[in-house]
Amino acid sequence: CLFLTSGCRAEKPLAGGSHPPVTLSSWVVSWDRERGMEEYEKTADLWDGISLFAADFDEKGNLHFPENLENLRPKGNVPVYLTVVNDRALPGGKMVEKDREMVAEKLKTEESRYHHVKDIIRLAKEKQVDGIEVDYEKIGQDRELMNHFCDFTRMLDLEARAAHLKVRIILEPSTPMSLPYSEGPEYVVMMYNLYGTHSGPGPKADRDFIEKMLKKMVHLPGKKAAAFSTGGCLWQDSHLLGLLGGKKKYITESEAIRLAETHHAVPERDPESAALHFSYKENGSSFDVWYGDRETMNAWITLAANEGISSVSLWRLGGVDMNGLRKD
């Protein structure tokens, strides 16, 4: 269970430290496989699980596994999960990301849910993974769909157990968590993108946001995990919460470090998030960068672990220095 402390508290800067032990997992993504696997192999002893990101759907609505993830098997005995996302190809090669309508169709009836579960398990067995991770996003505000999704999690858990597969369900921060989810899977709550390309400058997570999510997670059944994001975001000419600004894009830690060095900027650490930030000017534009490093990750992990979380996932392997992460 989760233990949420309260009462008078001196708001010290958020920082890492010793904490109850946690397991750590991460994702290797299809578009950055080589760098992701290189980083995994450098830090293999850290990891208790690796997810292959991701299977999606072709234009006919059938599951599609990316070629870049074929024959990927991390060394060691670490469990490997197959992540399934609700992105769908369109004729002509374009993709619809986070396709709510497709999920609604797949989960509409008991029969359609059963067929979808069987398709996922068939792919997982074909790719010889140890578990399934479902990451269906932008569905949380549709109550009827979420009821069907809860039915789907129960059916998936039962069928996966019979197939000797583990199940993890990824939930967005805005997803309702006091719904009748199955007790079997592990529920991984995304604790990131507090600030990002949808907003003005700021950290991907901070103390208040993480504590708010921990309280919300109390309603979830079974095992609970927190997911944090490495890297950061760059904002150009940001005004009025970014609404009138220029380009905004997510960047890796290594890209942020390179920008700071190129523009002779000295990053400062924000006490409420433990994230680093700096600004610079180029070609008449001003730029703001916020990003996390291992000190940031350790601070977030420490906060979650001290509140009862025993499993943490980090998005993602590729462009980040994972050395020095603390599991206890």
Q: Which role fits each region the language model picked out?
A:
Residues 11-116:
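Glycan-recognition patch characteristic of GH18 chitinases/ENGases
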Residues 29, 55, 59-67, 147-259:
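Substrate-binding surface in catalytic domains of secreted glycosidases
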Residues 29-45, 110-125, 172-178, 292-305:
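Short, acidic/polar
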